């Protein structure tokens, strides 16, 4: 196809540490992509809480769109994906500040109160969502107890909020909504019983599926992709067969596609989650991921390139491990101190800390994969790894050794590719 006739699409993929704008097009039957804009992201501390600068995110979204149009004049559509669970409250057309980040500790005190109304066993049976202290259900109940829901007329998950600010159309997208812990595993819609018993306001309409068209932003069609980044990432993995995957970033999401949710006792006991996919269920588990490594780097050797860090880890003889999913690693003041406190024998060098982190991640992958196979009754030969962590050969080797699987490491922007794929299919 001549370049002048080519259709271009824009994926805006925002992670907890950075965001990127990626323009994609079809060429020779494949999706080609080019990153045109990248920006930093991160939580900020305000009044003892962790928050997102939502206005800065919107500014970067618009700046990246302008950068994309400078290079690619005929962009057909755009879509936005981010991490799950976080949201913006609205009073009419005005957003309520602050926009809390999932690593904030405000939910800790309210979780027992939620369980006094809805025991976790009932919540899991109804929603199939694994326990995480930051799930939207606990955040919204914390808002209720703090009086933040007074006068609130709506809430939008972060990507849907940003899309609304671009095109003026509000929507609640299915894959991201499933991360709230408020969606019925049976119906695929918000669970009215849960919402009623928690006394939440009437702001839970019918959900929309990936591919739905919204309004326009400066002549560009806004589309709902799978706005939860992991759901888009799974769409972007070029699997030859259905096999387990790890979407490896700040979090490592390990899972497999299943026809329907699994909400049995074994799934609950092993803390597996059932999240929305594009016409399938994602049976998966959140694992702490590169958060451990990145925080250690920030603290121990902020200027050291990752290849040097990996070499130090490879050369270290330190073989102790920690529970990578332990709550003390979620948001510690010092990641080094958190490792020290969790280990009987303390690391003696920078390489020791990173070797411990990488080995701990590999063992957590192995444990989670064994649980997945037991719970689904299926055995797999391959494990696909995408995202930033797929570039780490040392971690891939450790994972292969622990799991006994053939590792298919694809250092691709799977999330952006999935986002683009959904837009292209919506344009058919």
Feature locations, PLM:
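Short glycine-rich phosphate-binding loop at a beta-alpha junction
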Residues: 74-82, 375-387
